Amino acid sequence: MALSGNCSRYYPRDQGAAVPNSFPEVIELNVGGQVYFTRHSTLISIPHSLLWKMFSPKRDTANDLAKDSKGRFFIDRDGFLFRYILDYLRDRQVVLPDHFPERGRLKREAEYFQLPDLVKLLAPEDVKQSPDEFCHSDFEDASQGSDTRICPPSSLLPHDRKWGFITVGYRGSCTLGREGQADAKFRRVPRILVCGRISLAKEVFGETLNESRDPDRAPERYTSRFYLKFKHLERAFDMLSECGFHMVACNSSVTASFVNQYTEDKIWSSYTEYVFYREPSRWSSSHCDCCCKNGKGDKGESGTSCNDLSTSSCDSQSEASSPQETVICGPVTRQSNIQTLDRPIKKGPVQLIQQSEMRRKSDLLRTLTSGSRESNISSKKKAAKEKLSIEEELEKCIQDFLKIKIPDRFPERKHPWQSELLRKYHL
């Protein structure tokens, strides 16, 4: 039986033809300006996800998707974080770098692409710790086998914890030629490195600290990747000194290498580190200062002085406060120096030693003053001798010049310029 042109053939569902796939095997994506190449099977590996809906072969949606000028499928999302989405689509796992700062943004991308399992993997890291809990020290220190000490978070630390170490290091170089050359290149410091606790480094250097190599770190953590925006060591030392730091150690290593085999110039390169430390404020001297101001300067009828009052006040305060915050001042033993006409005081061994020390100091002072006077006199004599020597040299020059005799008549010269010169000066 023949069928008319308006009739169409019926295919049952189990025997129907498969819907052709309009997507190529390798798909080129443009995600926020970043270009990615991936397989079509990777994009549709997780059912009911957004990428599965976009690139599913059951619907012909290839013409509905946005494309850029080069025909690549365009997705208006973060191109940097999309690499982790692709990693998860490949093997259901994602490996993030250490101290990854954009975990929250990656979680938002996973929610957008409708990947619930990836959202669960990223969710536990977003839970904030309560203030009563403690956090461990740096993961880098723990991985290197250091002591895993437990330290409280920055919110629980006392406000006056401002003590610690800061290490300042630099790699410098200088070129020195032969002695007497003026074109020698002096010290060159390309970069000043800063190591230590982040809170201390920010307190000392402030806006001059470059944190681009180690950003988004807690203030109580330690770093060795900060450096300063200026190149003057003395400026860094001044800033450390103004904040109460003093240098406790330093080390340096120097190497020399020739510029080339034809010259004697040497390039000296060195790496130097300076360790600075600021001590904690253990006690305050305000109470003792107040007692000294209120007390009498001279001894009164009771025989007590300002020092006695200050020591007694310090003793009373040391009993009330903790031993870590105060310094206990011991009692001051004083000897009575009462003298009468009937009974002269015998000089003890201590007084004899003190007198000998005073004599020794006076003798040393005399020798120093006499030495300085002699040096001044000798310097004046040397200056006078130098002046005389200059005058003598001038006199010798004048005498030598007077001894020069110019002949009345010069012999004839062979060259014409010589005769012209003689005629010019009428010789």
UniProtKB/Swiss-Prot annotation:
Residue numbers of Phosphotyrosine PTMs: Y112
InterPro entries assigned to the protein according to its UniProt record, in alphabetical order: BTB/POZ_dom, H1_KCTD16, SKP1/BTB/POZ_sf, T1-type_BTB
SMART domains: BTB (SM00225)
Tissue: Expressed in the brain, mainly in the hippocampus.
Modified residues (Phosphoserine): S130, S137, S143, S146
Domain named BTB: residues: 25-98
GO annotation, cellular component aspect: cell projection; postsynaptic membrane; presynaptic membrane; receptor complex
Location relative to the cell: Presynaptic cell membrane; Postsynaptic cell membrane
Pfam family, one: H1_KCTD8_12_16
GO MF terms, alphabetically ordered: G protein-coupled neurotransmitter receptor activity involved in regulation of postsynaptic membrane potential; G protein-coupled neurotransmitter receptor activity involved in regulation of presynaptic membrane potential
Main location class: membrane
GO BP: any one term: behavioral fear response
Keywords from the named record: Cell membrane, Cell projection, Membrane, Phosphoprotein, Postsynaptic cell membrane, Synapse
Subunit structure: Homopentamer; forms an open pentamer. In contrast to other BTB domain-containing proteins, does not interact with CUL3. Interacts as a tetramer with GABBR1 and GABBR2.
Main function: Auxiliary subunit of GABA-B receptors that determine the pharmacology and kinetics of the receptor response. Increases agonist potency and markedly alter the G-protein signaling of the receptors by accelerating onset and promoting desensitization.
Name assigned to this protein: BTB/POZ domain-containing protein KCTD16
Annotated organism of origin: Mus musculus
